[in-house]
Amino acid sequence: MYEKRERYMEDAFHKISRSIVDFLTENQIGNLVVGYNKDWKQNINIGKSNNQKFVQMPFARLRSYLKYKCEMSGIRFICNEESYTSKCDALAYEPVDKHETYLGKRVKRGLFRSSVGKLINADVNGAVNILRKVVGDSEIASRVIDRGLLLSPIR
């Protein structure tokens, strides 16, 4: 049973990583930034059965597949530490580090209320903050936030 699961996971991770790299190549995207948190699976509590399934998923393997496929395709792979990225307000350019109080807040699962009065997906807020840690605020402002792509995504 263990070998079957291993083969299943390896196949799935190869397919997922290939589809991501193909998307990046087709859209002429030259960098892939992936967030990483060292202890992110240690204190998880999503129910006994889900905990067992989730903690066993080898996300480090997915990152390694992404890295080597990006390198083969000429895409720069960046793995960046992601602490405090989901709590800080990306739209208000709040510094991404530990604070006593944060400008925005998560109003319910999956929804983040920015201090500028906008509602955005909480995962999008975290992803923008991970990217801000890598490229800086000025790059994010000119390419994403000020153009409205964050609040009105192109479909």
List each language-model region with its residue ranges.
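Substrate-contacting helices/loops that form the catalytic groove of nucleic-acid
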Residues: 1-60, 140-155
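Positively charged, low-complexity nucleic-acid-binding target-recognition regions
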Residues: 52-53, 57-155
